[in-house]
Amino acid sequence: MMLKQIIQIFTIKFISVLIISFPSAIIADYFNIPLAWFLGPMIVTSIAALSGLKIIMPKIVLSFILIILGLHIGNYIDQNLFNQMLDWIWTSLIMLIYIIICILVVAKYLQKFASYREKASIFSAAPGALGPLMILAENEKTDLSQVATSHLIRLIIIITVIPFIVVNNTDSNVLLNDDFSYLAQNHLNLILLIIASLFFIFVFDKIRIPAALLSGTLFASGLLQITDIASYKLPDETVNFCLLILGSSVGCRFAEKTVKEIANNSLHSIVATTILVVLGLVAAYVATFFVETNILTLILSFSPGGIYEVAVIAIAFDLDPD
């Protein structure tokens, strides 16, 4: 399995992704499009996939990028973060209520107006990451095509709209610290962080903790950093490469979809996404009464998108990704 993943890196299907993604990212950046290194590749690969171009995102490449992303976010973890755990109780409670309301409202809409069956409507309405929901939907013998298409269209909308909202409400962008000497760091710390990350990813995956690649790396980074065993700051420029791969991976998910299939689900997916976003904004506003957190960070927290995509947006705009 691992050998197959490595071989895919050298196939024309993946090389094609890189060939079309880099120019699209550079062009998007030239025109100052928010989150250019994500949106450019995402849009171009989506169009390419729907046009019939054979493209693929090897799981091993995506996994590597998610570990890098986890190490980036790990720099935000310190003792002060754990002092805020009381606040998490309130936001977690609000999140639970938000998810329940989202599923009830959107599922009912999809059943009534889009003729979705009950199980398909529930999995399509859930504001979570596509991967885990697809696994649950498959176990329940649900229409995977409806669930996947609904979430992919939603992800495209969310990831396209959110950067424009953020950039119009903050002056921050990807922060580049030119004064920091990356080469002067103890590079052994990076090796320790990677080894610890791989260990906890394996453990978290075995005990079925969601998003093991990210959560395992975060746990390892936080543990080693708080205990002063190891810490390491990756160059901020690597965020752009993470953005490019994540954006391309979203587009590659359309490889097995048809334009007709997307068109048939587009209208209802747009309506469902609008409902989820409105409910998310309400939840974020309610959360401001319980926690002292940037409203944009809360909006991202209650955004009905994938955890990896939302986390990388937080990093790109210097918002608290935890």
Language-model features: where?
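Short, hydrophobic transmembrane alpha-helix segments
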Residues: 23-33, 50-56
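Structural signature of hydrophobic alpha-helical transmembrane segments
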Residues: 27-43, 62-65, 88-99, 120-125, ...
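Alpha-helical membrane segments and immediately flanking helix-loop junctions
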Residues: 113-153, 294-322
